[in-house]
Amino acid sequence: MMKGRIISALLSIFMMLMSNTLRADNVISQFHILGGELSNSAATSVSDIEEVLPRMKVLGLNTVLVPVYWEFLESVEGQMDFTLFDRTIDVARQQGLKIVPLWFGAWKNSMSCYAPAWFKRDVKRFPRAVTAEGKPLEIASCFSNNVLQADLKAFSALMQHIAEKDPQREVIIMMQIENEIGMLESARDHSPMAEKAYKQPVPQALLKALGIKQPGSWAEVFGTDDYADEKFMAWHYACYVEHLAQAARRIHNMPLYVNAAMNSRGRKPGEYPSAGPLAHLADIWKAGAPSIDILAPDIYDIGFKSWVSQYAMPLRPQDGGKVKNRLFIPESRCCENSGVRALYAFGEHQALGFSPFAIDQASPKETESVTQAYNLLSQIFNAKPQNTWGLLFDQEDRERIIDDEGVVMTCRHYFTLPWDPRATDGSTWPEGGAMLIRLGKYDYLLAGSGVVIDFKTRIEKQQEQQKKLGEDGFAEAGSETSNFKFQTSNFNGSRLGLLSVDEVTIDHQGQMQFLRRHNGDQSHQGRHARISVGDWKLLHIQLYEYK
């Protein structure tokens, strides 16, 4: 009898652990974060929380990224106050929102500005990082065990409180550990504890992860320039974070991520936050912090497509068949282009989520595109799409050609069409973008704004003659040669035509609901499917083949 009870208890524990793991994995694999991150000071009072979260619901978000401030959580050492955090959970639950807490602990944007006053004042117990010139910084040293233990204690208390307040993860779905970790002014910390660590051999675990066989000191293995110093610092930041991540796993298992400020504009380590969870340091971070699920980019610079491609890391055999890094964008500039960028990230890279920063402070003109895109994405996800592409165009990057098993789709910015005066009035083109979904053979969905697509067979595309169109949609000028007649008279093969282009919605069951047919002038007499700049639509496109 006793033996049976013991076995039953062990099975219950096992199932609970498996359930926790599955729930954590399901957030990563199934839920799509249509998010927004609050500005840094938006959650410092109960009244602010009660005002801002309902506004986020109205904007169409399903998830809000909310700071949790160490200085408020533990303003008196050893005494935790969860008043702000509890109200955040309560209001989010009322609004039907998910929350991703941002642990503003030892570091926020490299600095230790959110550490409590008792921590800041006790420099002897909680030492600072030091530049190569010997200047102390307002950056707690990750080489100090006192710093780690103080941070870990508060973070663990937060995780324990989440486990008690939201045990089924109905509201809290993921956790960000610290914020934009990195060393500034120097590529690495030069404090006495850091110098001692620098003289030690490179850990075998890191050498193995990087495929380096020859052991040695950090200088011997990597050299002595700023980028070598950055590797040293990245390993130690990652190991620090791993302590917090392991605690989170033990207390209340959920997806965990760290975010990175980009190494942009030709800056060197220390000019940008050195050693953060950047793409070129991903192997070091994955080795030092294996409990972290995602390295996430904060994107404010130009070149959105290039940045996201670096963090949407593909399957590799050495990763045991696991995705090396699922794309999640916790911060992006909130602007009129945010909506099409979200569609691109989800369509091209099957992103976990997208989140414009300081969305609570953005103007209606800046948030409108987010609301429109999230409305389309919510409908698309109801249909559980499998085969998708992302489109994103601007004035320079105007066209993309996709060959989908013989269906050649030429996708362009809407302003490549000649009849919209905004295309040629000299103003900067807004970005156009969309998510393109294959439902089946000759069957597609297009969701977005500011794009146009035509569909051809491969042979059709090969023999296509480029002609500049006039504002009436016909050739701008006549041809004096018979070249056009020669090509068409010798055409041999099938062509694709538009069977129908319907504007639709998708309901909660994933079923399409017809709104209107796009034909005639709206499809250029069957030549293309298009969504104009400023419009946000979901089009169901069906093709047919003819000879």
Where are these regions (language model features)?
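The substrate-binding groove and active-site-proximal loops of carbohydrate-active enzymes
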Residues: I33-S45, P67-F85, A132-K153, H161, ...
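C-terminal beta-sandwich/jelly-roll accessory domains of carbohydrate-active enzymes
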Residues: P421-T428, Y444-K547
